[in-house]
């Protein structure tokens, strides 16, 4: 049997994302979400999560995306741009790492601050993942595992989507990035396993990240139904493309993603193919 976690990333980012995650959980197939500790709608998201106890909760470690740190910017300057925010893309962050510009005590301090803020909310956390998957970089992963053990969190996302899975991909640049990050993630799998952590056997949503619609969602679900085992699908739902797009220049199609995971066609396919919907807490 295929078991599927549908995780909505970026909970807390904005009220329009929070509302979409809850809508997708109540009326769609979303089973899990991951929180940005430094997002602008934190208190609202925590309250919503507590009112929906079947929704799995993860920590979404942010080190990129032009987002704000949880720490005072003066305490983590090596992680930030001159504007006091994280670099925009994973390429920018990786350049900083491999040119020796990142202070690792600052990196540990910020990751700990993000973890602590979410843990102090009283939510039961099922797993850790990362914005643009920076949590699996070999220089970041040991800190993430250390924090997971400190807070008794037993699962970490491994975003190693198959390099052969293109699924209506429209951007060669995105495809190259996906292959690189998936390779890094695959190398992280033994480390995560050897530290007694769980993850899914398969991951989907990287090549279509921010651009999932009904057509490519069906391509993903067909792949899920053909592979017995545990799967995670990453999505990014939201309620207002214009509002969110003006604030976050990521090019996401938030509304399309929400509509796809809530559609009757999606529900029917999952029932007909006996795909069991779970969250990370069910892996343990």
What is each residue range found by the language model?
Residues 2-5, 15-56, 60-127, 139-284:
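Terminal accessory/targeting
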Residues 8-11:
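DG-centered beta-turn motif at the end of beta-strands
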Residues 130-137:
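Active-site histidine-anchored catalytic micro-motif
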């Amino acid at each position: 049997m295929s078991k599927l976690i549908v995780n909505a990333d970026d909970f807390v980012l904005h009220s329009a994302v929070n509302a979409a995650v809850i809508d997708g959980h109540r009326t769609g197939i979303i089973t899990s979400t991951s929180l940005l500790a430094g997002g602008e709608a934190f208190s609202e998201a925590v309250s919503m999560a507590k009112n929906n106890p079947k929704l799995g909760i993860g920590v979404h470690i942010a080190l990129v995306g032009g987002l704000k740190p949880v720490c005072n910017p003066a305490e983590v300057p090596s992680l930030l741009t001159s504007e006091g925010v994280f670099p925009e893309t994973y390429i920018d962050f990786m350049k900083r790492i491999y040119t020796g510009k990142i202070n690792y005590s600052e990196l540990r301090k910020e990751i700990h601050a993000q973890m602590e803020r979410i843990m102090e909310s009283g939510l039961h956390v099922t797993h850790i993942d990362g914005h643009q998957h920076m949590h699996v970089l070999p220089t970041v992963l040991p800190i993430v595992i250390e924090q997971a053990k400190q807070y008794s969190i037993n699962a970490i996302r491994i975003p190693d989507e198959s390099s052969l899975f293109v699924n209506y991909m429209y951007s060669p640049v995105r495809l190259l990035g996906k292959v690189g990050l998936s390779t890094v993630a695959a190398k992280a799998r033994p480390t995560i396993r050897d530290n007694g952590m769980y993850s899914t056997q398969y991951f989907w949503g990287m090549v279509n990240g921010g651009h999932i619609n009904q057509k490519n969602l069906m391509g993903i679900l067909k792949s899920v139904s053909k592979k017995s085992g545990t799967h995670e699908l990453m999505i990014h739902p939201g309620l207002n493309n214009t509002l969110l797009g003006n604030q976050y220049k990521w090019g996401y199609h938030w509304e399309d993603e929400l509509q796809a995971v809530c559609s009757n066609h999606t529900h029917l396919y999952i029932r007909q193919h006996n795909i069991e919907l779970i969250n990370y807490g069910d892996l343990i």
